[in-house]
Amino acid sequence: MKKQLLAALIGGSLLAPMAASAADYVIDREGAHASITFKVSHLGYSYVVGRFNDFSGDFSYDAKNPTAAKVNVKVNTLSVDSNHAERDKHIRSGDFLNTAKFAEATFVSTSVEDKGNGDMVITGNFTLNGVTKPLAIQAHAVGEGQDPWGGYRAGFTGTTTFAMKDYGIKMDLGPASANVELDLVVEGVRK
């Protein structure tokens, strides 16, 4: 009995630091240290580039155990900004984002694959235009550490591509413009 109790205490004390080492972060939107940008081919000749100005989210991350990471992001699709007011109005319409009906896009991670050297694949459920489908983000841990204000930060980049038709966007701009590339820059402040 004493041996079992001792083994349980030792085992528990060894596992406790591992369980406590994952940290929760909130995406730093106030300091403008995060961005969600997109790029779509314009007829195969150039690109339309834009961003979402309003989004929020949080994540849990432990550099020693990246596969346990969790990510949750909400994007206000009304905040789309392609640097052209008339185009933004069209992007918000039923032809594309249908923001009158679906004013929010979300990403909730379901798994993280550690690729080594800070690289990972974050897979999750992406909801856009009322459609939810799995989406994989190629991500990289940029770094983490103390900031000058007494907080602790962790930063990441990510990229992914999806087909508009997969999310019920039926506007046909031709094959060169069928996909959207998303680029993500995320800096989180430890809660």
Curated annotation (Swiss-Prot):
The keyword Transmembrane belongs to this UniProt entry's keyword annotation: no
Keywords: Periplasm, Signal
Subcellular location per the Swiss-Prot or TrEMBL entry: Periplasm
InterPro entries noted in UniProt: Lipid/polyisoprenoid-bd_YceI, TTHA0802/YceI-like_sf, UPF0312/YceI
Pfam families according to UniProt: YceI
Signal peptide: 1-22
Record flagged with keyword Nucleus: no
GO CC terms: periplasmic space
SMART domains assigned: YceI
Family: Belongs to the UPF0312 family. Type 1 subfamily.
UniProt name for this protein: UPF0312 protein Shewana3_1179
Origin species: Shewanella sp. (strain ANA-3)
